Structure formats: structure tokens, C-alpha cells
Design a protein with these regions (language model features):
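Alpha-helical transmembrane segments
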Residues: 13-28
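Alpha-helical transmembrane segments of polytopic integral membrane proteins
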Residues: 61, 65, 114, 118-122, ...
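Outer-pore turret/helix-boundary of cation channels
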Residues: 30-50, 148-191
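Cytoplasmic membrane-interface regions of multi-pass membrane proteins
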Residues: 1-7, 59-75, 124-139
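Physicochemical signature of membrane-embedded alpha-helices that form the seven-helix bundle of GPCRs
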Residues: 44-52, 144, 215-219
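Pore domain of cation channels
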Residues: 21, 181-238
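Pore-domain transmembrane helices of cation channels
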Residues: 107-108, 120-171
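Transmembrane alpha-helical insertion/packing segments
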Residues: 28-120
């Protein structure tokens, strides 16, 4: 299967938020072993742990890409693009560790993830606008891109919500979502993003602050509009 050559900005747009999400899993699984961050050696906390997490994330991203591309679920990158993917994944894994130890880093990460999600949504809207033209039918490749986009959107929203929740924990304020800690927080954030974007909203997890309500409203409207467009494009060819 021939690889696809992509420039670095497009690889960042398509993969950074996904890589950032999977990079949260190793620290979450190991967090019970280190309940007090202050007791961890500084060089281990600020350099060794982020570097190790970056390497793990890079390997995970490469394996995910190879596994799903062999089943035509996603893009298979050529050699040069895979090196860029590894670099993006390493940076995402390196940065994700700081979300638990630095307020400033958490702010920066939240802004980066939000900006990348915005660019990805904008690029996706530009693409599906072409499929809204008369007599244009969605192909299997388009449907695969829809699925990739939807998963990326869910994980991007989960990361944004987790970052906002973490900021409030740093300041000792009331958590805007109260996802919990560690692996439970990740699971709850993904669950909440799914029911928000699909506009199900069971009400077991709710936003508690004005900022959280604004974020959730934006996520809900984004999911509602884009899901409607995607379903309309797909069913038009049936």
C-alpha cells in the first residue's frame, strides 16, 4: 500500500490531539504508585518522565497507524511522513506529563489543543462543503475520514475538558466537571464528550462553572451541526 506524503502542519492537525490523548494513559495508570508528586526527584519529574512518555506515545502512534491503515481505516504515511508522525507523537507525550505538575503548562496545552482542534474542524468543514454539491456522492474513503474526524473530535473535546478540570484542581477551586483523578478521569472525560457531542446528555456528569458551560455549549453545537452534515452526505448516496 503506497504511503501518503503530508506536510508537518497537516500531520499535527490530524494527529496531535489523538496522540496527546493516548499519552495520558501511562501517567494515569502509574499515578497510584506516586501519590505525592512533590516527593519525586525533580530531574525525573521534569525531564526523564516526559521523555519516557514521549517515546511510549511515539511507538503507540506508529503501531496505531500501521494497524488501522492496513484495514483502510486511516491514512498510511510514507517513510518521511512517519518520521514527522513520530516527532508529533513524542512532543504530545512529552507535554502531557506537565498537565499534572504545572499550571502554566496546563494553560499552554489547553490553548494548543483548542487551536489544533479548531484548525482540524475548519479544514474538515472545507472538505465536506465540496461533498454538499449536487450529484456528488461520498466514497468509502470519505466515510473513513468522517469516522476518523469524529473520533478525533471526541478525543480533542475530552482533552480540552480534562485540561480545564486540571486547572481548577491546581488552584484548589471547585472542579468544573469533577471527572475524578487518574484513569477514572480519562474514562469519564471521554464518556462525557461522547454524550455531549451526540447531544444525548444523561445528566450524571454536568458542568459546574460558567466557563465549563460555555465549553460544553460549543462542543454540543459543533457535534450537532457536523453530525447532521455527515449523516446527510452519507445517506444521500443510499
Amino acid at each position: 500500500m503506497p504511503g501518503l506524503k503530508l506536510n508537518l502542519p497537516r500531520i499535527i492537525s490530524r494527529n496531535f490531539n489523538f496522540c496527546f490523548f493516548i499519552s495520558l494513559l501511562p501517567p494515569a495508570l502509574l499515578s497510584p504508585l506516586y501519590p505525592d508528586i512533590a516527593q519525586i526527584t525533580p530531574w525525573l519529574l521534569w525531564l526523564a518522565a516526559p521523555a519516557a512518555n514521549g517515546l511510549i506515545t511515539a511507538l503507540e502512534a506508529l503501531m496505531f497507524n500501521r494497524y488501522f491503515s492496513n484495514r483502510n481505516f486511516t491514512i498510511f504515511y510514507d517513510v518521511s511522513a512517519r518520521y514527522k508522525l513520530l516527532a508529533v507523537a513524542f512532543c504530545a507525550g512529552f507535554m502531557s506529563v506537565y498537565i499534572n505538575i504545572s499550571v502554566f503548562a496546563t494553560w499552554i496545552i489547553a490553548l494548543i489543543v483548542t487551536y489544533i482542534a479548531f484548525r482540524y474542524i475548519r479544514n474538515f468543514i472545507a472538505r465536506i462543503s465540496k461533498l454538499l454539491r449536487p450529484a456528488v456522492m461520498a466514497t468509502l474513503s470519505d466515510i473513513g475520514d468522517f469516522a476518523n474526524f469524529f473520533v478525533n473530535l471526541i478525543l480533542s473535546c475530552a482533552v480540552i475538558n480534562l485540561a480545564v478540570d486540571s486547572l481548577y484542581h491546581h488552584f484548589g477551586s471547585t472542579a468544573p466537571f469533577n471527572f475524578g483523578q487518574g484513569l477514572d478521569a480519562i474514562i469519564n472525560a471521554v464518556y462525557f464528550s461522547i454524550i455531549t457531542i451526540t447531544t444525548v446528555g444523561y445528566g450524571d456528569i454536568i458542568p459546574h462553572t460558567p466557563l465549563a458551560r460555555i465549553i460544553v455549549a460549543a462542543e454540543c453545537l459543533t457535534g450537532y451541526i457536523l453530525l447532521g452534515l455527515m449523516i446527510g452526505i452519507i445517506t444521500r448516496g443510499i
